[in-house]
Amino acid sequence: RTGGFSRTDEALKANAIHARQIAKQHGCAMFYMSQLSADAENKVVLNQAMMEGSRTGKAAEADLMILIAKNPPVEGQEEEDTMRHLNLVKNKLSGWHGIIHCNLEYKTARYVV
């Protein structure tokens, strides 16, 4: 459902604009979550072109974009790999772009460097 929009990407962009307006109105941070497309599967280095749906509309409204990747699966590996890669692909706040490699502590839901 696209809520009256002719295309899904238009609806997603409108949602991102609305979220940004709420954040500005209340002077707070707004977290907008989205999934990546199949292009990102099994990749550690990600970019905003891998976002599902509205690649440019959602990105245009963001001040900071963090895309989270995990290591590709290893054949025969039974234990879940907790290594995660935080790709900062857009950063209007400090300007720094890059990847932070860390571990996911799933019991506490924290990323630890």
Positions of predicted regions on the chain:
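P-loop NTPase motor core
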Residues: 1-85
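Conserved P-loop NTPase
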Residues: 64, 70-113
